[in-house]
Design a protein with these regions (language model features):
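Glycine-rich, small/acidic residue-mixed loop/short-helix segments
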Residues: 248, 253-360
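Well-ordered alpha/beta subsegment
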Residues: 100, 105-108, 112, 117, ...
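A glycine-rich (often HGG/GG-containing) alpha/beta subdomain
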Residues: 45, 56-103, 135, 143-189
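Glycine-rich, acidic
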Residues: 3-7, 18, 24, 127, ...
Length: 360
């Protein structure tokens, strides 16, 4: 089991540790609900160093990434980041990822922890044609996400970089608490604003401690993966392995906005064009339960007659809305907001309705 550079810190803070994507990770500290509300109302701090990072550079870098991802790299300028996904050649998704343009011909790519090796092999296979230089820096890179309405003012205490000048999905390289060459990125997976900072492992404890100290007055709390999941779900963000995977297309998953069919040739471009013309037979939708219950991954979705029309991909009891809600693939005819559906929970069909995301 791998450990992040902050493992000892989590143990010292009394975090409950669980195996996740080959890492021993903190699932919670004080408690999921408390951590969730801290991020929505004040600020929370997450160790997400298990994520993967690649540097892809050189004359072939842009063409390689433009070919293996769905989004359009032509819209990326230095200091800008882009959400995208890797199609698998059969219309499914290898992974979703964020691409940071560091400079001309230099890209920093962030992938999901569970897919580091898979993504590396997938991109490498196509790189035989493009000849870009690829470096996997996952093992020496740490990542802290500081999220919530007060996150920016906490981080600002530790850096001379003017954070208010970094728009959403933009980044800069700066100094934080004296640590140089930190990637300071206005991104996150909570929908509550804030930053993600990338740096070398040896600076992890220093920066964690500095943030803890800087955020005392604002009520900053350490948060685990469980709160990260309830936070992202309330915003309707996809989780790889649940809501998207090798069997789901970006168009089915509501990721048409990052699938730029007019950008030129790329993996599965023809498949997606055809799928767009013909329409998809199922769609990923948000739903809310109308009765008590907690929907979970893989629970069947049925219609009024009890016919299976889909399945739940992610579900929870929402701390903010105090109801069961989630994401599910349903037959397209049931995908319109307000459509009546039922979630099968312990052999009971619980009434639910399709809603637009975000939920909060």
């Amino acid at each position: 089991m791998k450990k992040t550079a902050l493992y000892n810190k989590h143990v010292e803070l009394g975090a409950k540790m669980v195996p996740f994507a080959g890492f021993d990770m903190p699932v919670q500290y004080a408690g999921v609900t408390e951590e969730h509300f801290a991020v929505r109302e004040k600020a929370g701090m997450f160790d997400v160093s298990h994520m993967g990072q690649f540097i892809i550079e050189g004359p072939g870098a842009k063409d390689l990434l433009q070919y293996v991802t769905t989004n359009d790299l032509n819209t990326l300028t230095d200091g800008k980041a882009q959400y995208s996904c890797l199609p698998n050649g059969q219309g499914g998704i290898v992974d979703d990822l964020i691409i940071y343009k560091m400079a001309d011909e230099v890209y920093f790519v962030v992938v999901n922890a569970s897919n580091i090796e898979k993504d590396w092999n997938h991109i490498s296979k196509f790189n035989e044609k493009f000849g870009a230089k690829m470096t996997n820096i996952s093992d020496e890179t740490s990542l802290i996400a500081i999220q919530g309405p007060l996150a920016t003012q906490i981080l600002q205490k530790l850096t001379s970089t003017n954070l208010s000048e970094i728009p959403y999905y933009h980044f800069t390289i700066g100094t934080v608490d004296g640590v140089q060459d930190v990637i300071i990125s206005n991104t996150g997976y909570t929908g509550s604003g804030g930053f993600e900072i990338y740096f070398k492992n040896e600076n992890a404890e220093q920066l964690w401690n500095a943030l803890t100290e800087a955020g005392k007055e604002e009520g900053l709390v350490p948060c685990g993966l469980a709160a990260r999941d309830t936070l992202r779900l309330e915003k309707g963000f996809c989780l790889y392995g649940n809501d998207i995977d090798d069997s789901t297309s970006p168009l089915e998953a509501g990721l048409g906005w990052i699938t730029k069919l007019g950008k030129g040739d790329f993996v599965d471009a023809e498949f997606f064009k055809k799928q767009k013309e013909e329409g998809v037979s199922r769609k990923l939708v948000g739903f809310e339960l109308l009765d008590k219950g907690v929907p979970r991954h893989d629970y069947p979705v049925v219609d009024a007659e009890g016919n299976v029309i889909g399945k739940v991909t992610s579900g929870t009891s929402s701390p903010m809305k105090k109801i069961g809600l989630g994401l599910a693939y349903v037959k397209t005819e049931f995908s319109k907001p307000e459509s009546a559906i039922f979630i099968q929970i312990r052999n009971k069909n619980i009434p639910a309705k399709v809603v637009k995301t975000p939920f909060v």
